């Protein structure tokens, strides 16, 4: 299925890989000598990574770490595989988040996106984990994604600038029904809309398009 004018291909299912143990050796090609360790946890949550390719005994997975778009081949024996029916498309042009399940759109919401000086990054990412909201203004929870700001390297001395999906942070009026550019790159949703993303599991693909 294709979504919107950007012709995003929406799969019915996405294969996701959960890293077993402390980590798995990552290589630039299947069977090559490892060049990195793909950690079994990131921000104290299990690493659940979308699979983008397979070869006998190997899977190519997206990574949550910088730079954006990172991927690695890891041995299939070091992961457990599952199918994920969800897919998220964030269209910066219409300032909306679209949620799909089994290839069909089930919801879409107006979204607060990055301002021109701190734009929301474009590309293919995924849900890395659900985190506790640091304050009620962030909503019931924060969805940490694998996307990182291209213009901010260290947000509030956190050591990184990760793009998250969370509550409105006081910008409900600005977001309204049409969305708005109000953030430093994160995606802000009205609280009732955010809670509808609760069933989405870690590893769910997120495609951010212009």
Regions found by a protein language model. Name each.
Residues 1-50:
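Beta-loop motif signature
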Residues 10-21, 46, 54-58, 69, ...:
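Extracytoplasmic
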Residues 76-115:
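A structural motif detector for short, solvent-exposed N-terminal "entry" segments of globular domains
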Residues 61-62, 98-100, 166:
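Beta-strand residues in well-ordered beta-sheet regions across diverse protein folds
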Residues 37-77:
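SH3/SH3-like beta-barrel superfamily modules
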Residues 65, 78-86, 115, 124, ...:
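Exported/periplasmic cell-wall-interacting domains
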Residues 32, 65-69, 103-107:
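Short, surface-exposed beta-strand-loop junctions and turns on beta-sheet-rich folds
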Residues 1-12, 63-90:
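Boundary regions of SH3-family modules and the immediately adjacent low-complexity/disordered segments
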